[in-house]
Amino acid sequence: MSIAKRVQQWATFARTWHIYDCTWQNPFESAKLVKTHLLGLQKPIYHPMNDCGDHVVLINTREIALPGDEWVKRVYFHHTGYPGGASWTLAWQLHEKDPTMVMKKAVYNSMRGNLQRRHTMQRLHLFADDQVPEEILQNVTNQIRTPRSIPQRLDHIDKETLENFPNIMDYPKDYILR
């Protein structure tokens, strides 16, 4: 067996660590991407009864972006198990309490119908910001590409770039913008 084939085989059977930046990403679109790596769907040895998934580290879950008015319309259900223990929490309230919970529930729900999803969720590591412990970062070997590009905010662009940006119209100096 050649060295290249041997390395490819090791990579297939080993658990790889991936990192994913959730900044300005839709958690439900991101959950589909993360699910493929957690379950090992991208590996040639995948089988539903085979536990061949990888570890995924999600950073900046505080910066997720829900589409439209999902923050005020999406409701999460929880039951304590006691009579009258049902509670419904809005997405923005849940995100305020725990910035990782909306993303965690999105990934959990994307694996619907999988009997091993509770065990699989143990390989998901969530962080509200980019402060990740060093022992976890040492294991990371791959970065998952985000489906959306992150737009640059106007207040983060330096003045020199703004002044050199081409103008569509040159207004006269005495023109008043209303």
Curated annotation (Swiss-Prot):
Localization in the cell: Mitochondrion
Source superkingdom: Eukaryota
InterPro entries: Ribosomal_uL13, Ribosomal_uL13_bac-type, Ribosomal_uL13_sf
Ribonucleoprotein is among the record's keywords: yes
Keywords: Mitochondrion, Ribonucleoprotein, Ribosomal protein
Record carries keyword Ribosomal protein: yes
Gene Ontology biological process terms in this record: mitochondrial translation; negative regulation of translation
Assigned GO CC terms: mitochondrial large ribosomal subunit; mitochondrion; ribosome
Pfam families: Ribosomal_L13
One of the record's GO molecular function terms: structural constituent of ribosome
CDD domains associated with the record: Ribosomal_L13
Assembly with partners or alone: Component of the mitochondrial ribosome large subunit (39S) which comprises a 16S rRNA and about 50 distinct proteins.
Family statement drawn from the similarity comment of this UniProt entry: Belongs to the universal ribosomal protein uL13 family.
Protein name: Large ribosomal subunit protein uL13m
Originating species: Drosophila melanogaster
Gene that specifies this protein: mRpL13
